[in-house]
Amino acid sequence: MGNFKEDIARVKAFVFDVDGVFTDGGIMPLPNGDFVRKYYAKDSYAIVYAHRMGFKVCIITGGRGELLRRRFEYYKVTRFIDGCTDKITELRRFMADEGLDPSEVVFMGDDIPDLDCMREVGVPVAPADAAWEV
């Protein structure tokens, strides 16, 4: 990682974790086994805008559920991977499939399972309230 302006100028794709990145981290279980997550509406527009501007958008999350899947399918992300137990493998597969160099990718995560992915990409970022290890 060098000069931030130079690093960000190369970006062609954004890859995100979900819980703690698009949400406040709170999860409420439903009787059917699914979970309700509280999302910030402005994040949704950012996904749509990035897509319109030609960026690839990928979601890689350990969470799973029908509501989660429907939310990101609605916003037509390039790739959605839920229930993931090996994020770095999925990140590498996404980059290979899309012809991306790691320097062209932003990864946003908030917790320890995201660290390998953050080390892999050119622009690792985290929310202000991320785990201190991140």
Where are these regions (language model features)?
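Acidic, Mg2+-coordinating phosphoryl-transfer loop and its flanking beta/alpha structural elements
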Residues: V106-V134
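Non-catalytic pre-domain segments flanking phosphatase-related domains
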Residues: M1-F16
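A positional/architectural concept
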Residues: F22-R52, G62
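Short beta-strand/loop segments at the ligand-binding rim of alpha/beta enzyme cores
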Residues: M53-C58, D97-V105, G122-P124
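Short, well-ordered beta-strand core segments
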Residues: F14, V57, F80, P124-A126
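Short, acidic/turn-prone active-site loops that include or flank metal/cofactor-
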Residues: G83-I88, D129-W132
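Conserved Lys-Pro-Asp/Glu-containing loop-to-beta segment of HAD-superfamily phosphomonoesterases
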Residues: I88-L115
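Substrate-recognition element of Asp-dependent hydrolases with the DxDx(T/V) motif
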Residues: I47-R71, I81-D82, M118
